[in-house]
A protein has these predicted regions:
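Structural beta-sheet core signal
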Residues: 34, 174-176
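Glycine-rich phosphate/diphosphate-binding loops that line cofactor/substrate pockets in enzymes
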Residues: 163-172
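Single conserved hydrophobic/aromatic residue that forms the stacking wall/gate
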Residues: 183-186, 190-193
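Cofactor-binding loop segments of dinucleotide-utilizing enzymes, especially the Rossmann-like FAD-
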Residues: 57, 177-179
Length: 193
């Protein structure tokens, strides 16, 4: 959660309050699945009646946690799932980046809520190669590997650049097109990297 859509929200506190109001709409028998890597995520869960299920890469106390994270030669993640404090299965992703390990943890938490087996999840993940315009391999030309990504705010840009950092290449070139205030702010972040 970060400052985005400031044409609608006043500031970051307004954004957090909006998430909290939304979470409070969940019924008591519902589930809120939330990333503990979000700064002050408890602001969002405050006062809700639904069950809170957590996941995270940085928080070993999260209900769903990735342990023994490693990356293959294409930057695709491997990890051991820790579910409710117990080491369970190993997972191999076919998409690159730490952020996709986090996305996978969220999907595993959802699957758990619906009693979808680890084997079924692993089958689904084995065929998942990413989505259009998210670190999408476009081809090679004159010795360059072309990757397209529509990262449009600072956190996404950092995640994309982190994915690129472990991708096999000699030198990284970035073509960046800022088309909004958030993109311009992201450009400042990009220049800091």
């Amino acid at each position: 959660i970060e400052e985005d859509h400031l044409d609608f929200f006043k500031d970051i506190n307004d954004i957090r309050n909006s998430f909290n109001r939304f979470a409070n709409l969940l019924p008591e028998n519902g589930n809120l699945i939330i990333n503990t890597d979000i700064e002050n995520y408890q602001d969002i869960t405050d006062g809700i009646k639904a069950k809170v299920i957590t996941y995270g890469i940085s928080d070993e106390t999260a209900d769903f946690y990735a342990k023994n994270i490693s990356y293959d030669e294409n930057g695709c993640g491997n990890f051991t799932l820790v579910r409710y404090g117990k080491e369970t299965e190993k997972y191999q992703l076919h998409v690159s980046g730490r952020h996709n390990i986090s996305n996978c943890l969220a999907a595993l938490a959802v699957a758990d809520c619906y009693d979808i087996s680890a084997k079924q999840v692993q089958m689904g993940l084995s065929g998942f190669r990413g989505t259009e315009r998210r670190f999408e391999y476009k081809g090679e030309k004159n010795g360059f590997t072309i990757i397209d990504d529509y990262a449009h705010h600072p956190t996404e840009i950092k995640a994309t650049l982190s994915s690129a950092a472990v991708y096999p290449h000699q030198k990284l070139w970035v073509a960046f097109q800022p088309v909004s205030y958030t993109h311009l702010r992201a450009h400042e972040t990009l220049s800091d990297l």
